[in-house]
């Protein structure tokens, strides 16, 4: 989507996939502990089970954790949902100390602002039943759009 926009981002974007989360955040922890320019990382987006449903009464529900000391991250999502008419119902969770068992923790420990898209503990989490037929594709599509917009703000906002 960034390439298709025709606009070159102000900052570099790195897409990464980690391994060993359940074994102690091995991949993300190694990355942040060995990265020579860690202070240059302006933000981190993490996704856990974002196509899943944990609330039968609200199929567009998800949790949006973000670093509390960076309230613009929450404002960006609110504005983008309204402006682009995304069918999402986020539970905003500003977080003073965003650590925990997922990979955003490795970045938060280095004072890097994080966003963590999550659907709470849903029935298929880390189970053999976690398969394509359980994905809510419309929600996954809108979360993908929202995360693109959040990344767009992070890489193009001159004051970020």
Place the predicted regions along the sequence by residue.
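Surface-exposed patches in mature extracellular/periplasmic domains of secreted proteins
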Residues: 5-12, 86-97, 158-160
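Metal-dependent peptidase/peptidase-like ectodomains
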Residues: 18-119
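His/Asp/Glu-rich mid-to-C-terminal helical/loop segments that flank catalytic regions of hydrolases
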Residues: 4, 122-160
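Generic, well-ordered alpha-helical scaffold segments in large soluble proteins
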Residues: 1-5, 34, 80, 110, ...
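Alpha-helical metal-binding/catalytic segments enriched in His/Glu/Asp
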Residues: 1-24, 147
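Secondary-structure transition/capping motifs at alpha-helix termini
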Residues: 1-10, 35-40, 157
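Residue-level preference for alpha-helix termini and adjacent loops
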Residues: 8, 30, 40, 106, ...
């Amino acid at each position: 989507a960034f390439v298709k926009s025709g606009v070159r981002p102000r900052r570099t974007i790195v897409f990464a996939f980690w391994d060993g989360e359940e074994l102690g955040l091995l991949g993300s922890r190694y990355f942040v502990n060995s990265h020579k320019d860690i202070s240059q990382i302006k933000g981190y987006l993490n996704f856990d089970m974002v196509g899943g449903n944990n609330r039968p009464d609200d199929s567009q529900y998800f949790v949006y954790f973000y670093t509390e000391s960076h309230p613009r991250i929450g404002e960006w999502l609110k504005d983008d949902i309204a402006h682009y008419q995304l069918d999402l119902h986020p539970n905003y969770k500003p977080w003073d100390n965003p650590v925990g068992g997922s990979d955003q923790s490795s970045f938060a420990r280095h004072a890097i602002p994080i966003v963590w898209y999550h659907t709470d503990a849903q029935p298929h989490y880390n189970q053999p039943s976690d398969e394509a037929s359980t994905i809510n594709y419309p929600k996954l599509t809108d979360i993908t759009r929202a995360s693109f917009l959040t990344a767009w703000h992070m890489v193009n906002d001159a004051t970020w």
